[in-house]
Amino acid sequence: MSFSPDEINDFKEAFLLFDRTGDAKITLSQVGDIVRALGQNPTNAEINKILGNPSKEEMNAKKITFEEFLPMLQAAANNKDQGTFEDFVEGLRVFDKEGNGTVMGAELRHVLATLGEKMTEEEVEELMKGQEDSNGCINYEAFVKHIMSV
């Protein structure tokens, strides 16, 4: 997949929104956020691989230009391992004890905080905000739509 000139201009605009110092550069730690803001869904492990597995110090100190970032975005876009809507719904269906399209909010919180790419409590709360019904249940298809649009 290659990008059109218009897409590249849009990507550069988004990239520059993350530039905190006005030098048209971002830190490596921001790459995942920008890639996700541009519609890709790579895991943190995939981002680290694309970045060449930098140290924590490099993640916060090393800066890159848009020209260095674009091939990284390309690599994320070309990765066929990204989960689809159906993949995520299928993964959550395992926790649907009643078979009614919902999962318990408490159980989903636990899963997000302890399995796979573990999320912090704050990240989980931010993601779950407004998703539970009065019984503490979450419609997981609506939840997946929500997280894929964030």
UniProtKB/Swiss-Prot annotation:
<dbReference type="InterPro" id="IPR002048">
    <property type="entry name" value="EF_hand_dom"/>
</dbReference>
<dbReference type="GO" id="GO:0043292">
    <property type="term" value="C:contractile muscle fiber"/>
</dbReference>
<feature type="modified residue" description="Blocked amino end (Ser)">
    <location>
        <position position="2"/>
    </location>
</feature>
<keyword id="KW-0677">Repeat</keyword>
<dbReference type="GO" id="GO:0016460">
    <property type="term" value="C:myosin II complex"/>
</dbReference>
<keyword id="KW-0514">Muscle protein</keyword>
<feature type="domain" description="EF-hand 3">
    <location>
        <begin position="83"/>
        <end position="118"/>
    </location>
</feature>
<dbReference type="InterPro" id="IPR050230">
    <property type="entry name" value="CALM/Myosin/TropC-like"/>
</dbReference>
<protein>
    <recommendedName>
        <fullName>Myosin light chain 3, skeletal muscle isoform</fullName>
    </recommendedName>
</protein>
<comment type="subunit">
    <text>Myosin is a hexamer of 2 heavy chains and 4 light chains.</text>
</comment>
<feature type="domain" description="EF-hand 2">
    <location>
        <begin position="44"/>
        <end position="79"/>
    </location>
</feature>
<dbReference type="InterPro" id="IPR011992">
    <property type="entry name" value="EF-hand-dom_pair"/>
</dbReference>
<feature type="domain" description="EF-hand 1">
    <location>
        <begin position="6"/>
        <end position="41"/>
    </location>
</feature>
<feature type="domain" description="EF-hand 4">
    <location>
        <begin position="118"/>
        <end position="150"/>
    </location>
</feature>
<keyword id="KW-0505">Motor protein</keyword>
<dbReference type="GO" id="GO:0005509">
    <property type="term" value="F:calcium ion binding"/>
</dbReference>
<keyword id="KW-0518">Myosin</keyword>
